[in-house]
Each structure stands twice: as C-alpha cells, then as structure tokens.
C-alpha cells in the first residue's frame, strides 16, 4: 500500500487542487431568435447558425 513519506503543506495541497474547479459552459445567442443555447447545439426553437434545422417542440 502506498504511504506518503512527508506531510504535504497547505500551500502544496492548494497548488495540487488548483485545476479541480468547475467552469460555466460557454453560451451562445441565436441571431435569428435571440435565444440562449449551448455552443454547437441546436437552440430550443430548432435553429442552428441561423437556419431552421428541426421543428420546435409543439409545432
């Protein structure tokens, strides 16, 4: 079993965890309808990059 040789200081522990945070996903605004959606995804009303590619829910 692996056992540490020396205790890691709070500074080193913080440096080790410095990349563990979460970031918000980048959002895009659809130019035709103004709706907000995830980048590279179809907006809820069925538009992608200004073109209608899917029928919207309820159409």
Curated annotation (Swiss-Prot):
Compositional bias segments (type: Basic residues): 49-59
Pfam families: Ribosomal_L32p (PF01783)
An example Gene Ontology biological process: translation
Alphabetical UniProt keywords: Ribonucleoprotein, Ribosomal protein
Any one GO CC term of the record: large ribosomal subunit
One GO MF term attached to the UniProt entry: structural constituent of ribosome
Region of interest called Disordered, as start-end residue ranges on this chain: 1-59
InterPro entries on file: Ribosomal_bL32, Ribosomal_bL32_bact, Ribosomal_zn-bd
Record has Ribonucleoprotein as a keyword: yes
NCBIfam families: rpmF_bact (TIGR01031)
PANTHER family associated with the record: 50S RIBOSOMAL PROTEIN L32, LARGE RIBOSOMAL SUBUNIT PROTEIN BL32
Family stated for the protein in its record: Belongs to the bacterial ribosomal protein bL32 family.
Protein name per UniProt: Large ribosomal subunit protein bL32
Highest classification ranks of the organism: Bacteria, Pseudomonadati, Pseudomonadota, Betaproteobacteria, Nitrosomonadales
Gene that specifies this protein: rpmF
């Amino acid at each position: 079993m692996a056992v540490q040789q020396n205790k890691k200081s709070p500074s080193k522990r913080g440096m080790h965890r410095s990349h563990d945070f979460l970031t918000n996903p980048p959002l895009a605004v659809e130019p035709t309808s103004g709706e907000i959606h995830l980048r590279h995804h179809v907006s809820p009303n069925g538009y992608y990059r200004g073109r209608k590619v899917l029928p919207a829910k309820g159409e």
